[in-house]
Amino acid sequence: MNTSTVSPVVDLVTRARSAQRVLDSYTQDQIDLLTQAVAWAILEPSRNRELAELAVADTGLGDVEDKVKKNYRKTLGLVRDLNAAKTVGLITHNPEIGVSEYARPVGVVAAITPSTNP
């Protein structure tokens, strides 16, 4: 891997770790609002189209109109799935065995996205 590839990745990971430090103190309500804000930002029609156009231009695959629809459906589905999910703080407590489960941000998650599903 050459430095022109590594440098942007290092910059992104640094920014993600900085964001993680901020999110460490967020409550469940704040995380829920953040999740909804990100979803609505993606669903905003001009931004959705921009993302769809970028995906088609970057991969050479698909059709912009189909990508716009897919972005819309998948984003709404993800928000629906995350809506009632506990993601920070106390998740479960079992007093019978004295075990409590807590969730918190633990690190940066990165993935290589298949070009067929950007």
Question: How would you name each of these model-derived features?
Answer:
Residues 90-118:
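Substrate-binding/gating loop at the entrance of the active-site cleft, primarily
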Residues 1-100:
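N-terminal Rossmann-like NAD(P)+-binding subdomain of aldehyde/semialdehyde dehydrogenases
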